[in-house]
Curated annotation (Swiss-Prot):
Gene Ontology biological process terms from the UniProt entry: intracellular phosphate ion homeostasis; positive regulation of transcription elongation by RNA polymerase II; transcription elongation by RNA polymerase II
Cross-referenced Pfam families: Pkinase
EC number: 2.7.11.22, 2.7.11.23
Source organism phylogeny: Eukaryota, Fungi, Dikarya, Ascomycota, Pezizomycotina
Protein name: Serine/threonine-protein kinase bur1
Length: 580
């Protein structure tokens, strides 16, 4: 078989179309860093143009190229629009030394002086309404192009909107984007309906629409339009308008702003998997008009259309562009008429924050499958428990936790069957220790929430994954402690583990212990036979959590049931420590 000759660069390395050497660029400084990688400002030695270099982190070299980066590269190479960030080429940094280490890869894009979030945090920047209209029209034109080509962005937020000193806005960060199987939106028809399921583990929490928070799987382009509404409001207020501290709090903030869902304003909401936690909120009419009372009626009208609870009727990009807001005075500025500002990137924002003062914390939820590396942050349990426990129970529990350390909040993505086994054992040990500690000090019913469907959705989107832990998120929190030392402790646990190519680690979505079973236990007449009958009626998504000192009897029961042993010898190592 004949092998085509390869063009070689000045250093004798093979040059491929669309791929160059990192030596062709002069580094000018770092713009930002995070779990996604590192971003640098650089100058091309070939033509003198200023570019941004986004280094792709290879957290486990044996596993190959990160799938989120592959997805982003593939989509950006397909797209071509003034308001979509262009991927100019890929750059390779070959390893030094013996060459056994894999080369580093960089995405090369045009340099944009700002992102919208950075501009809004700059105390020297104040947007005029013509400027807001100009940016909004460009954002909507970019989304119209994406949705018209059946692409969902799935992480619409101010930080992902880049702005040049020429006033041009471009949509960036396509790590969560994916092709969309439904027809493109049509005028007057909102986002339409979806016919297939998608993962709900998308969109940064502060910009996440209510249907995703309620676990709608068949979502549409309307999820991006909700993010546009959040960005629109943010440009008026100068800060995020829905900065929730948790998914539940995020839902509360949304309903406080736009009103409580009903079957009239959000048909079908009460049948969504996540509705149970919000049914007790109580009716609220919404405060959007009051919050934005300083804006003109047309702006409020567009904001209401973008933040509509009913995703089927939420305005699409086509209709938003034609909204009367943009044809009423003051008219939109042209990009070239906008003022220029000092650069506003991640490192610049740190300085701005010192000038402006404290701003809301970074979204704790984030976009789960956007995480590209292991990140472990200490999360003190005692702080999380403050104000949530009955006084007597809190005193006992705090005393015990002070002796054992802290829990961890972890975002992790990794692969490998050996690591899986070790990880599962350590997580199980940590949870058992925690649960047993609680039981030992008064808790008597433990609920563990585990969403298998979301994990399956991630797997199915990218095909068979074999022995991979593709994207996992472990969050341990303690809430809803009841009075008199008898507690229902809810420990939300979301973790996707592919034990092998055929078996997904089973979990628990909700406890099926009814009040009758609780009453039987209270009366002292609850038997193992009664619990066994309950387990027989469980589905894969409804698994019972049992608490008992009789370990052998529990082991004889359903193997997918989580066994929680009330044994003091397990109350030793609450601190979960792992080295990657």
């Amino acid at each position: 078989m004949a092998i085509a000759s390869l063009e070689r660069d000045d250093h004798g390395n093979p040059r491929f179309r669309g791929c160059t050497s990192i030596r062709d660029f002069e580094f000018l400084g770092k713009l930002g860093e995070g779990t996604f990688g590192e971003v640098y400002k650089a100058r091309s030695k070939k033509d003198g143009s200023i570019v941004a270099l986004k280094k792709i982190l290879m957290h486990n070299e044996k596993d190959g190229f990160p799938i989120t980066a592959l997805r982003e590269i593939k989509l950006l190479k397909m797209l071509s629009h003034r308001n979509i960030l262009q991927l100019k080429e890929m750059a390779v940094e070959r390893s030094k030394g013996d060459g056994r280490k894999k080369p580093s890869m960089y995405m090369v894009t045009p340099y944009m002086e700002h992102d919208l979030s950075g501009l809004l945090e700059n105390p020297a920047v104040n947007f005029t309404e013509p400027q807001i209209k100009c940016y909004m029209l460009q954002l909507l034109e970019g989304l119209k192009y994406l949705h018209g080509n059946r692409i969902l962005h799935r992480d619409m937020k101010a930080a992902n909107l880049l702005i040049s000193n020429n006033g041009v806005l471009q949509i960036a960060d396509f790590g969560l984007a994916r092709p969309y199987d439904e027809p493109p939106p049509e005028p007057g028809k909102g986002g339409g309906e979806a016919k297939r399921d998608y993962t709900t583990l998308v969109v940064t929490r502060w910009y996440r629409p209510p249907e995703l928070l309620l676990q709608l799987r068949r979502y549409t382009t309307a999820i991006d339009m909700w993010g546009v509404g959040c960005v629109f409001g943010e440009m008026f207020k100068g800060k995020p308008i829905l900065a929730g501290s948790s998914d539940l709090n995020q839902t509360q903030l949304i309903f406080n702003l736009v009103g409580t869902p009903t079957e009239e304003n959000m048909p079908g909401w009460s049948s969504l998997p996540g509705c149970e936690g919000v049914k007790s909120f109580g009716y609220k009419p919404g405060s959007l008009r009051e919050v934005f009372k300083d804006q003109n009626p047309m702006a409020i009208s567009l904001l209401e259309e973008l933040l509509k609870l009913d995703w089927r009727k939420r305005i699409n990009a086509i209709d938003a562009i034609n909204h009367p807001y943009f044809s009423s005075p003051p008219f939109p500025a042209r990009p070239g008429e906008l003022p220029s500002f000092e650069d506003s990137h991640e490192f610049d924002r740190r300085r701005f924050r010192g000038q402006r003062g404290a701003i809301p914390p970074a979204p704790a939820g984030g976009s789960v499958d956007q995480q590209q590396t292991t990140e472990i942050a200490v999360f003190p349990v005692l702080h999380a428990l403050a104000g949530s426990l009955h006084t007597g129970f809190k005193t006992i529990l705090q005393s015990a936790l002070l002796k054992t350390g802290m829990l961890y909040h972890m975002d992790l993505q990794t692969r490998g069957s050996r690591f899986q086994a070790s990880l599962v054992q350590k997580i199980a040990a940590c949870l058992l220790n925690l649960l047993c500690l609680l039981i030992h000090h008064g808790a008597w019913v433990i609920q563990i929430g585990r969403h298998v469907r979301e994990v399956n959705a991630i797997i199915s989107e990218d095909g068979p994954m074999g022995n991979w832990i593709h994207t996992s998120r472990l969050t341990v929190t303690l809430v809803d402690i009841l009075e008199k030392g008898k507690a229902i402790v809810r420990v939300p646990l979301l973790i996707g583990v592919i034990w092998n190519s055929n078996t997904l680690m089973k979990g628990i979505n909700r406890v099926i212990l009814g009040t009758d079973v609780l009453q039987e236990r209270e009366a002292g007449v609850l038997t193992f036979e009664r619990l066994e009958q309950r387990i027989e009626h469980c589905t894969d998504d409804d698994k019972l959590v049992l608490v008992s000192t009789d370990a052998e009897r529990l082991r004889q029961m359903n193997p997918v049931t989580l066994l929680v042993l009330n044994d003091s010898k397990f109350i030793t190592h609450l601190l979960l420590s792992m080295t990657y």
